[in-house]
Each structure stands twice: as C-alpha cells, then as structure tokens.
C-alpha cells in the first residue's frame, strides 16, 4: 500500500481535525474547511451520530494520519505498546512521539512531520553524531539530535525554526539550540505532555475486539 500523497486538507476535513500536516504559521481554518467533509457533496453531507465502532475507527485513522503511518505500521506499534508495562494507550503515544521524524518536528527543524521525515530520509539528521536516515528510529532519553551542515543551510529549516520560536512549539521534553541546529531529547514524555486532542482509549478498544 502506497503512502498517501494527495491533498492534506482533504485528510484534515475527513477527520474534522488539525492533523499538523500544514505549517502552523497560518490558522488552519484559513487553509482547510474542517467543518466540510471532502467530496462533491461535502458541504451538504448529513451529520449523524456515529456508532461506537465508527468513533473508534475514526480516532485510529486520525492518529495514523497525524503520524503519517500505514495500517501495518500502526498495528505493529500497537502490538509493541501492548507488551510493555503500563497503560497500552499511553505506551502507544510514547512510541509514536519518540520516532525520529516526530522528534525532529517537535524540535522545530521542520514545520510538518512529512517535512521532518524528508529531512531524515535525505540524511540530514544525526543522532549522537551518527547519520540516521530511518524515520522510525526510536529516540532515547539523552540522545543528541543535530542537522547536517547541508540541511542546516536550507531555507525551509531556518523558516521552520522561526515559526517554532514565534509559536513556542517546542515541548518541555526537548531542549533545542536553534543557533547550532542541535537538540537534546531530554526524556520520554508523560501523558500530560502528549497531545490532549487524542483519545487513545478508543484505539485500544478498537484493537481489543
């Protein structure tokens, strides 16, 4: 199954939520009509109450699209989360947040996760001084993240850092030196530090059936 490369607003409208697929420099509602479903009849589509299954499925689809994962990848993360000690839903979000592409995004080196993934795949990122081009690489507490000299010179990276600073986007669990294009992954985030608009319990319920 190929990765989706179509209009990102279409995905956001389908889920009725900001999937962080576009730069936060402009308000999302000025770019995507979230209240309008995609398709020719999206503006007039009837809104009915979703079944429990449909609600769970929509939440899973939303999170998959936020992190840019295919179903098999996402299911594998869930399986891994279910074998770890603690809350399965929280474990799942922590695994997703500690992906290298997500950490690069959280540090403000890219305005979106897809842009961060491209930086990683093009060998623009190092972890503890070693080049890593695997977006799914799991970052550990204390890891030092840095951009290559070539990547640091890219205008899009410099613009991303400006946007991150203006909107105070970097979370407390990363430490960034924007002048040196480096960052430290301080610790795996707690649930209180993770996205509040995600209901991971619905995903656990879906996969537990």
UniProtKB/Swiss-Prot annotation:
UniProt key word Ribonucleoprotein: yes
Domain S4 RNA-binding: 98-161
GO terms under biological process: ribosomal small subunit biogenesis; translation
CC per GO annotation: small ribosomal subunit
The UniProt record lists the keyword Hydrolase: no
UniProt cross-references to Gene3D superfamilies, sorted A to Z: Ribosomal Protein S4 Delta 41, Chain A, domain 1, RNA-binding S4 domain
Record's keyword terms, sorted: Ribonucleoprotein, Ribosomal protein, RNA-binding, rRNA-binding
GO MF entry, a single one: rRNA binding
Signal peptide: none
InterPro entries per the UniProt record, alphabetical: Ribosomal_uS4, Ribosomal_uS4_bac-type, Ribosomal_uS4_CS, Ribosomal_uS4_N, S4_RNA-bd, S4_RNA-bd_sf
Pfam families according to UniProt: Ribosomal_S4, S4
Record function comment: One of the primary rRNA binding proteins, it binds directly to 16S rRNA where it nucleates assembly of the body of the 30S subunit.
Subunit structure: Part of the 30S ribosomal subunit. Contacts protein S5. The interaction surface between S4 and S5 is involved in control of translational fidelity.
NCBIfam families: PRK05327.1, rpsD_bact
Family note: Belongs to the universal ribosomal protein uS4 family.
PANTHER family reported for this sequence: 30S 40S RIBOSOMAL PROTEIN, SMALL RIBOSOMAL SUBUNIT PROTEIN US4M
Name the record gives this protein: Small ribosomal subunit protein uS4
Organism annotation: Stenotrophomonas maltophilia (strain K279a)
Gene: rpsD
């Amino acid at each position: 199954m190929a990765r989706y490369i179509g209009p990102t607003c279409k995905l956001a409208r389908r889920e009725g939520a900001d999937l962080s697929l576009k730069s936060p420099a402009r308000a999302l509602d000025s770019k995507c009509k979230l209240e309008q479903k995609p398709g020719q009849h999206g503006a007039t589509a009837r809104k009915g109450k979703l079944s429990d299954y449909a609600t769970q499925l929509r939440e899973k689809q939303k999170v998959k699209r936020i992190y840019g994962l295919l179903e098999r990848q996402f299911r594998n993360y869930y399986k891994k989360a279910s074998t770890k000690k603690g809350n399965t839903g929280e474990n799942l979000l922590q695994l997703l947040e500690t992906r290298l592409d997500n950490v690069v995004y959280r540090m403000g080196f890219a305005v979106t996760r897809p842009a961060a993934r491209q930086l990683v795949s093009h060998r623009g990122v190092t972890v503890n001084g070693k080049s890593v081009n695997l977006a799914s690489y799991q970052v550990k507490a204390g890891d030092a993240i840095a951009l290559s000299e070539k990547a640091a010179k890219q205008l899009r990276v410099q613009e991303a850092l400006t946007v991150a600073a203006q909107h105070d986007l970097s979370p407390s669990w990363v430490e960034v030196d924007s002048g040196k294009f480096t960052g430290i992954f301080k610790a795996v985030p707690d649930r209180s530090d993770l996205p509040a608009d995600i209901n991971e319990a619905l995903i656990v319920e879906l996969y537990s059936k």
